[in-house]
Structures are given as structure tokens and as C-alpha cells.
């Protein structure tokens, strides 16, 4: 494979990517800019230390005949990603690759960008032709290869179909790098976070189920969560209980389990109060919550500062005439496993379903043969079901907020549901991003990961800032000490220190 083929690789990637992150034109790349995004000296353009030298020439083991991969560190990956973002694609490939390459080099570029192949057949083919050498540097491996060049060491060991797959995987890796922010190089400690928190004026807070689990509200997607508890219902997909089409056809599917997700009234966690504290200090730009429990309102977060991305139990509406009432008005129906019915559609419903005789229990509304949807005149909580559009307020506010925020804090969320999950890539790259969660979110690049229970992390941060959280448990929480263990650069495990036994 020679420089001509490498140019074809560039052309292929550019053409495949047309309309996404690159455009064709003299083999140049233009990254899509976010509107009015600031250019900042804090942007991640600082080159990191690396042992590798470029272009990297892969050596071959004279005994096994396998290509030898040098060790690729996290700094090497960051360096390559920064270079790709700062330069056009042609420059990137010419800098990191020698003039003559084979498909093994394409795989090396995929690894250098921090990715790997997923195709099992391709992975096995690569494995049979590659060995790693963690001790030798790129320069040493280069000298090994140079001695063997006369032996036609660059003959491609992979089949053509494998080479094509590798080129496509490299294109995907490049697209992923260009569409994802990189970590800020000088923001990776709790002290960096607290210093920024004290000075921030427009904090964007994105919350998920983890902020409510301390109150006994299940996280739908956890192993002990709601979805695992309703598998006995025999649904093909547990998420079907929140499917709009299924609700319209048979609302009893939802109302058979609605009591399990009914939020507690007038309760909220210390984490909710932490957000309220940010609001009271004039620091909160907006809290975007994916939760439907409406606990933010109980904590005192102003409606103007709150966007319930997936709706909530705060209100309920008739699916037929759209009459709306406060959500708490149907809580008793939910607890009694009853269908909450609209008084304005009730008489018509009785005509359509005479067998019910006005009875609104869930069981009596399951097996009607009427062509009219069983949801006629039924009140539905104004939460966003699968198949429904997000509330219009989300789209109206997020466009402005992502450009104004000076700090993003994601709390108790796995960021698996779009479009909310895309917020982290919409915020300007110079804005620090913090994750407070029980587990890592590996598909996003947070500058700081604080892993632990949300209430514990919020208490630790408040104490370090010398702030008081306006919650009834605060006096007890402020007495607790925490262990902060750095498990990786920018990643800390937060745990309560065990209390000393009184003698």
C-alpha cells in the first residue's frame, strides 16, 4: 500500500463523511462549529507528553512474523485526538503515518484514537498478525522495521474485505473524535471544581434517576430498578409500559404498575436541596431533569429555573379532550389501581363501553371489543412516553442555555437517552464538565468524575465550599467525613468514612 492508496483512504473517509463532519474540497476537513462558540485559551489544545515518535513505523517480530505494536498510553490518545481536532484530516494522516503503509497501520490509527474494532472475524484476523511490545519505544521498533524493509515486510497480511472494514472503522473513529469534546487539560481535581463553582454564575445542571434513589424511588435501568421488577408482567420489553401506542390501545398496562413509580409527596433529597442552594446563590442557570417525579418543585426550585425534559406527574391530561388537572388529583386513582377518567368525556365513554357500567377499575377495562380506543376519556400523567415528542420548552431553552452556561454538572444520569444525552456535546468545549454519579459514563468526556452516592458528593462539595445545604438532614450530613480516592486522572471515588466506635 503506497501514498496513492493512503490518499484514496483520505478521499474515502471524506466522501463517506460528507455532510457530517467533513466536506470534500482539496482533501480538507472543516469541523462543524457550534453557533457563536467562543474561542478560548482554555480549549484543549495543549500537547501532552508522549513516548511515541511520528510517523510511527511498525516493526516485525523476526521469529513470529507478527507486527509489533508499541504501547499506546492515554496521553498518546489525547495527543492524537488534539492533533486531529486542530488540523485537517490530510495533515493528520500524513503526520502520523509513514508514506508506505498496509492495513495494520489503519488499525494502529484506530487504536491511537482510543478505539478498537468490534467485528469478531476482523479482530481475530488482526490478532493473528499483531503482537504488542510494551517495553520498546516507537523509535526502537522503527529501527527493527527499517532493517527488514528489503524483505517486503509491507505486504498486507489481511484480506481485502478486512482492509475495507478497517477503513470504515477508522472513519467512524474520526467522526466520533470530531463530534465529542475533549477533556480540559488543566481541570481534573476537586479543588478545580470547587474554585470554579464559587465563581460560576450560570451553571447548567443535568439530573437523572440517581438524584432520587436515596428516597426509595427506583432507577428504571439499574439491576434492582423498576424494569427488573416488572418482568413478571410478561412484556416483551419492560419499557412498553411507557409506550404511547400501547397506552392508547390499553391504558391498563400502565395503570397496573403506575403505583410503583408514583413519587412521594413533599419529599426531596439533599441533592435536590444542593441545586436549590445554587439557585439561592444566583448561580443556577437551569436544571434540566430527566426525572418524572417532580421532586425539584418540592425542593423549591423555581419553575423558570426548571426544565422537566421528560414531563412529570405534576399535571395530568385527558388523552381525548386534553382537559388538564394537577397531577396529585389522580394519585388516589393510581394507588387504587383505577383508571382516572375525564368528567367531560365520561358519559360518552359509558356509551362506548356499556359493559363497564361506569366502573373505572383497571381490570374491567382490559378486554373490550369496541373499535374505540380503550384510552377514550382516560387521564394520562403529562410525562413523555416513548413515541412522544419532548416538551417544547426543552427545545426553546436549551439552544440559549448551552451558549450562556459557564459550568455543566451532570448528576445521577447514565446519559443513555437522546436528545438529553447530547447536551454534553452541545456545550462549548471550553466550559468545564463534571459528572457526579455512582458509575462512570464512558461514552462522554467529563473533565472530572466524582463517583459515589449523589447526596454524599453534594455534601462533600458543599463542605469544601463552606456552604450550607438547605435540607433538614444537613446538620447531620455536615458532621460526616469522606474518603476521596483518586482511581484515575480526573476520577475520584467518594465514600463516607466509617464512624469510629465509641469506647
From Swiss-Prot:
Pfam families for this protein: DUF592, SIR2
Q: How cofactor binds (record note)?
A: Binds 1 zinc ion per subunit.
Start and end residues of each Deacetylase sirtuin-type domain: 183-468
Which reaction does this chain catalyze? N(6)-acetyl-L-lysyl-[protein] + NAD(+) + H2O = 2''-O-acetyl-ADP-D-ribose + nicotinamide + L-lysyl-[protein]
Question: Is Repressor set as a keyword in this record?
Answer: yes
**Active site (record annotation):** 310 (proton acceptor)
GO MF, one annotated term: histone H4K16 deacetylase activity, NAD-dependent
Transit peptide found in the keyword field:
no
Which residues are NAD(+)-binding?
Answer: 208-227, 290-293, 412-414, 437-439, 454
Q: Where in the cell is it found?
A: Nucleus
Annotated Gene Ontology cellular components are: histone deacetylase complex; nucleus; Set3 complex
Give the signal peptide as a residue range, or say none if absent. none
Q: What is its EC number?
A: 2.3.1.286
Q: Where does Zn(2+) bind?
A: 318, 321, 342, 345
Please tell me what else the database record remarks about this protein: Present with 1440 molecules/cell in log phase SD medium.
| Role | NAD-dependent histone deacetylase involved in telomeric silencing. Histone deacetylase proteins act via the formation of large multiprotein complexes that are responsible for the deacetylation of lysine residues on the N-terminal part of the core histones (H2A, H2B, H3 and H4). Histone deacetylation gives a tag for epigenetic repression and plays an important role in transcriptional regulation, cell cycle progression and developmental events. Restores silencing at HMR in SIR2 mutants when overexpressed. Required to repress middle sporulation genes during vegetative growth.
Q: Which family does it belong to?
A: Belongs to the sirtuin family. Class I subfamily.
Query: Quaternary arrangement and interactors, per the entry?
Result: Identified in the Set3C complex with HOS2, SIF2, SNT1, CPR1, HOS4/YIL112W and SET3. Its presence is however not essential for meiotic repression by the Set3C complex. Interacts with SUM1 and RFM1. The interaction with SUM1 is mediated by RFM1.
Q: What is this protein called?
A: NAD-dependent protein deacetylase HST1
What is the species of this protein?
Saccharomyces cerevisiae (strain ATCC 204508 / S288c) (Baker's yeast)
The lineage is: Eukaryota, Fungi, Dikarya, Ascomycota, Saccharomycotina
Amino acid at each position: 500500500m503506497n501514498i496513492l492508496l493512503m490518499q484514496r483512504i483520505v478521499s474515502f473517509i471524506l466522501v463517506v463523511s460528507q455532510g457530517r463532519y467533513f466536506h470534500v474540497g482539496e482533501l480538507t476537513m472543516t469541523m462543524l462549529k457550534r453557533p457563536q462558540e467562543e474561542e478560548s485559551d482554555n480549549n484543549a489544545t495543549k500537547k501532552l507528553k508522549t513516548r511515541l515518535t511520528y510517523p510511527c513505523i511498525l516493526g516485525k517480530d523476526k521469529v513470529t512474523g507478527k507486527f509489533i505494536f508499541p504501547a499506546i498510553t492515554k496521553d498518546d490518545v489525547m495527543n492524537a485526538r488534539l492533533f486531529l481536532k486542530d488540523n485537517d484530516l490530510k495533515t493528520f494522516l500524513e503526520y502520523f503515518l509513514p508514506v508506505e503503509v498496509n492495513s495494520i497501520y489503519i488499525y494502529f490509527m484506530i487504536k491511537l484514537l482510543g478505539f478498537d474494532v468490534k467485528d469478531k472475524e476482523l479482530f481475530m484476523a488482526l490478532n493473528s498478525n499483531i503482537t504488542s511490545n510494551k517495553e520498546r519505544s516507537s523509535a526502537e521498533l522503527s529501527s527493527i522495521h527499517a532493517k527488514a524493509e528489503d524483505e517486503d515486510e509491507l505486504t498486507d497480511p489481511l484480506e481485502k474485505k478486512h482492509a475495507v472494514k478497517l477503513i470504515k472503522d477508522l472513519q467512524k473513529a474520526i467522526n466520533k473524535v470530531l463530534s465529542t469534546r475533549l477533556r480540559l487539560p488543566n481541570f481534573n481535581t476537586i479543588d478545580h471544581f470547587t474554585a470554579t463553582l464559587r465563581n460560576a454564575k450560570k451553571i447548567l445542571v443535568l439530573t437523572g434517576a440517581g438524584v432520587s434513589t436515596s428516597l426509595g424511588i427506583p432507577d428504571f435501568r439499574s439491576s434492582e430498578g423498576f424494569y427488573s421488577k416488572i418482568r413478571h408482567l410478561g412484556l416483551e420489553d419492560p419499557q412498553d409500559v411507557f409506550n404511547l401506542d400501547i397506552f392508547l390501545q390499553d391504558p391498563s398496562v400502565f395503570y397496573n404498575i403506575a403505583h410503583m413509580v408514583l413519587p412521594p409527596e413533599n419529599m426531596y433529597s439533599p441533592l435536590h436541596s444542593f441545586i436549590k442552594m445554587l439557585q439561592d446563590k444566583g448561580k443556577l442557570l437551569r436544571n434540566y431533569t430527566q426525572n418524572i417525579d417532580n421532586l425539584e418543585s418540592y425542593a423549591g426550585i423555581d419553575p423558570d429555573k426548571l426544565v422537566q425534559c421528560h414531563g412529570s406527574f405534576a399535571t395530568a391530561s385527558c388523552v381525548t379532550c386534553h382537559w388538564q388537572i394537577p397531577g396529585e388529583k389522580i394519585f388516589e386513582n393510581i394507588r387504587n389501581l383505577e383508571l382516572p377518567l375525564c368528567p367531560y368525556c365520561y358519559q360518552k365513554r359509558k356509551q362506548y363501553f356499556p359493559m363497564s357500567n361506569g366502573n373505572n377499575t383497571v381490570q374491567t377495562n382490559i378486554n373490550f371489543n369496541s373499535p374505540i380506543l380503550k384510552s377514550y376519556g382516560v387521564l394520562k400523567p403529562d410525562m413523555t412516553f416513548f413515541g412522544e415528542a419532548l416538551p417544547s420548552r426543552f427545545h426553546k431553552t436549551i439552544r440559549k442555555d448551552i451558549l450562556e452556561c459557564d459550568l455543566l454538572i451532570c448528576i445521577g444520569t447514565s446519559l443513555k437517552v437522546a436528545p438529553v444525552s447530547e447536551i454534553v456535546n452541545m456545550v462549548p468545549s471550553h466550559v468545564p464538565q463534571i459528572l457526579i454519579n455512582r458509575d462512570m459514563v464512558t461514552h462522554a468526556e467529563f473533565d472530572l468524575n466524582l463517583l459515589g452516592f449523589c447526596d454524599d458528593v453534594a455534601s462533600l462539595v458543599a463542605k469544601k465550599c463552606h456552604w450550607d445545604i438547605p435540607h433538614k438532614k444537613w446538620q447531620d450530613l455536615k458532621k460526616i467525613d469522606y474518603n476521596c480516592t483518586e482511581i484515575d486522572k480526573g476520577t475520584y471515588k467518594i465514600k463516607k468514612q466509617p464512624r469510629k466506635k465509641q469506647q
